[in-house]
A protein has these predicted regions:
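Non-catalytic interaction/regulatory segments
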Residues: 1-160
């Protein structure tokens, strides 16, 4: 599956509303097929439930390959991290070439640094991603840890 667009809203009382626009090569041309969509929904619910039941750290990701198009027209990866609301929350903006598993790698890196996502806007345009996150966490309050987070995120988005 590929995530074309996502919006993530997290409340202070640990509730989340996440919406994803997903495509699947297996469903190409069948998005108006109710049976195919029901199958996709069942599969995704089972995968989410399995992940919730595991209650363990996120597994290592298998790095996806860049497409020929992304290799032919490379994009300079970019990360911007800006404080908002008296440094309580931070806006993280990432621009990079897309590849399978990239969003997962970003999420895993944020988790490893103890960062929680309060709001996210995930956009995929062809081979390019423009993702914006509103994040918070102890690591953001210390410049050295903030720099390490940015370095780790850059390593994720810059690797092919």
């Amino acid at each position: 599956y590929s995530i074309l667009d996502a919006r993530i809203h997290t409340s202070r009382d640990a509730h989340a509303l996440d919406t994803f626009q997903v495509i699947s090569p297996r469903l190409a041309g069948q998005y108006d097929n109710a049976r195919a969509l029901a199958c996709l929904e069942t599969h995704m619910q089972a995968a989410l439930q399995q992940a919730l039941d595991a209650d363990s750290p996120l597994p290592a990701v298998q790095r996806g390959r860049l497409s020929r198009r992304a290799k032919s027209f490379p994009m300079e990866p970019h990360i911007q991290l800006d404080a908002e609301e008296k440094n309580a929350r931070w806006r993280l903006t990432i621009h990079a070439s897309d590849r399978p598993g990239l969003l997962y790698q970003i999420a895993r890196t944020l988790t490893q640094h103890g960062i929680s996502v309060q709001l996210a806007k995930i956009s995929t345009m062809g081979e390019r991603v423009e993702d914006t996150f509103l994040i918070e966490g102890e690591a953001l309050q210390r410049p050295q840890l903030r720099d390490q987070l940015q370095q780790d995120l850059f390593a994720v988005i810059a690797s092919a």
